[in-house]
Regions:
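Metal-dependent nuclease catalytic cores that hydrolyze phosphodiester bonds in DNA/RNA
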Residues: 1-86, 91-95, 105
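Short, intrinsically disordered/low-complexity patches at protein termini
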Residues: 43-46, 109-111, 159-160
Length: 160
């Protein structure tokens, strides 16, 4: 089975054409927005762990789920007395919604992996750098079936 990364999943849902240019054709150049997002993620992908306000924070955490064939890194996982919480960093808050669907699906995939690895039910938050705020993200039952369909679609395109 072809493993799909969290990043690839998010890119596919954002724009399948752009995903194809990046992942299949390898014909994509980074622009200002990609560079800005990379700078935001620099600390999150440092691999450094630290403690702050009663929470232990682990950055650049490897996650995977062999059953689903998904793999990748989460920006950070925080451990507190309340349990684990995945935090994903994004440069800008969407104008019309709290969380874009492509970002929510990326976080859902990360949650499935973390829940399986750590045998828990972790919380999920998204942090928007432009407003310097975190927002809780929740998922309904439709995410499970949608993720399965999307991963199958992506694997069909990759296999061509």
């Amino acid at each position: 089975m072809e493993y799909i990364s969290f990043r690839s999943l998010q890119h596919y849902l954002y724009c399948p054409h752009r995903w194809g240019l990046m992942e299949i054709d390898r014909a994509w150049a980074e622009n200002f927005y990609v560079v800005k997002a990379n700078a935001l993620h620099e600390r999150a992908h440092s691999g450094v762990s630290y403690s702050l306000r009663g929470r232990k924070t682990y950055t650049d955490v490897d996650l995977w789920n062999d059953e689903l064939g998904i793999i990748g890194k989460t920006d950070c996982i925080e451990e507190s007395k309340d349990g684990l919480c995945i935090v994903e960093y994004k440069p800008t808050k969407p104008k019309t919604e709290l969380v874009r669907h492509d970002d929510a699906m990326q976080l859902f995939a990360q949650k499935l992996c973390a829940d399986a690895i750590f045998e828990t039910d972790c919380k999920v938050q998204i942090y928007y750098a432009d407003v310097k705020r975190r927002f809780n993200v929740s998922f309904d039952s439709s995410f499970d079936s949608e993720l399965t369909v999307i991963l199958s679609e992506m694997r069909r395109y990759i296999a061509r």
